């Protein structure tokens, strides 16, 4: 019986910790507007001017390809860059969790 109580308590603690660690999409939208919108557009669809000027393809952030990425994969791209996308060093910690949460809202 004591083992069952410990298991239930541990499960509750981990589920609250996971919910607390998740980003806030509303706060993430503000981060996105500041750090991502110029290239990725207001709705996650690439800015055509940037695509033409940089001669790049920018994935639709609401696409299945992006949405199937893990949060850690998205964070790695934001903080480390990929291809012609530079690393965004100003987005860290909670802001990084928040922007990932916002990107999840762009799912098509």
Spans of features found by a protein language model:
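Post-cleavage N-terminal segment of exported redox proteins
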Residues: 1-24, 73, 77, 102-108
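Periplasmic/extracellular electron-transfer cofactor-ligation site
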Residues: 23-56, 80-89, 105-108
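Extracytoplasmic electron-transfer domains, predominantly the class I c-type cytochrome c fold
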Residues: 53-107
